[in-house]
From Swiss-Prot:
Organism: Arabidopsis thaliana
Name the record gives this protein: Putative 26S proteasome non-ATPase regulatory subunit 8 homolog B
Matching InterPro entries: 26S_Psome_Rpn12, CSN8_PSD8_EIF3K, PCI_dom
Function of the protein: Acts as a regulatory subunit of the 26S proteasome which is involved in the ATP-dependent degradation of ubiquitinated proteins.
Family statement: Belongs to the proteasome subunit S14 family.
Subunit structure: Component of the 19S regulatory particle (RP/PA700) lid subcomplex of the 26S proteasome. The 26S proteasome is composed of a core protease (CP), known as the 20S proteasome, capped at one or both ends by the 19S regulatory particle (RP/PA700). The RP/PA700 complex is composed of at least 17 different subunits in two subcomplexes, the base and the lid, which form the portions proximal and distal to the 20S proteolytic core, respectively. Interacts with UCH1 and UCH2.
Residue span(s) of domain PCI: 38-217
Keywords carried by this UniProt record: Acetylation, Proteasome
Length: 233
């Protein structure tokens, strides 16, 4: 077995042992260490043994211990984590491992509908989905996703406009009040200026001058190539 994979497996075994005896301080420490291997695990090939060892341990014990009542909740949170990190391919890989009955569970269904809205660009639906989250633990990831969406819109807006009115800014960035917009500007974009009821963007790009296309030169070159081809033929 790969040495790094062996280390991950050993750390995971220690994590399980600490969890069984309710040593949550050790659990927290080991979980932090396991997170460091996250990107390494992404690069692994889809080998059944590796998956069973590192990612799908619960499948091995399904017939030995009763399913956790939190199983669907945790799987739903993992899907949200992948969505927030924009790891869409892995999101769909995880979905492919779930049964049709599991896909109908509210915790899973909520994450699937959220991904569909996100990919369609229906950002209002994404933000409003926070109110229908199946569990309060989802709110953390929903807030991260909302920030990701607003940052993306903000980046596009400052490149497309010189300024926006505060009301237009609220609508564009999906805020329900002027104060929310002002707080966002102060915390996330101090380079923007708010004055006279406008949000003035600080231009970060330089407009490159358009170069004239040397059309006559291109025509002459094309005719020259044509004459050369005629000689060859």
């Amino acid at each position: 077995m790969d040495p790094q994979l062996m280390e991950v497996s050993q750390q995971f075994e220690r994590f399980k042992a600490a969890f069984i005896i309710k040593d949550f301080d050790t659990c927290s420490s080991l979980l932090s260490q396991l997170k460091l291997f996250d990107h390494y695990l992404i690069s692994l090939s889809l080998n059944a043994l590796l998956l069973l060892t590192c990612a799908l341990f619960f499948l091995c014990t399904r017939n030995r211990i009763p399913p956790s009542p939190q199983e669907n909740l945790i799987m739903g949170l993992n899907l949200l984590r992948l969505l927030v990190q924009n790891r869409i391919a892995e999101f769909h890989t995880e979905l492919g491992l779930l049964s049709s009955a599991t896909l109908e569970n509210p915790c899973i269904k909520h994450a699937v509908e959220l991904e569909q809205s996100f990919m369609e660009g229906a950002y209002n639906r994404v933000l409003s989905a926070r109110q229908t989250a199946p569990d309060e633990t989802y709110v953390y990831f929903m807030d991260l996703l909302a920030k990701t969406i607003r940052d993306e819109i903000a980046g596009c807006s400052e490149k497309a406009y010189d300024h926006l009115s505060i009301s237009e800014g609220c609508k564009m960035l999906l805020f329900s009040s002027d104060q929310q917009l002002l707080t966002y500007v102060n915390e996330e974009h101090p380079e923007w200026e708010v004055k006279d009821g406008l949000v003035v963007f600080q231009k970060t790009r330089e407009t490159a001058p358009c170069k004239e296309i040397p059309s006559l030169q291109l025509i002459n070159q094309t005719l020259s190539y044509t004459r050369e081809l005629e000689r060859i033929l």
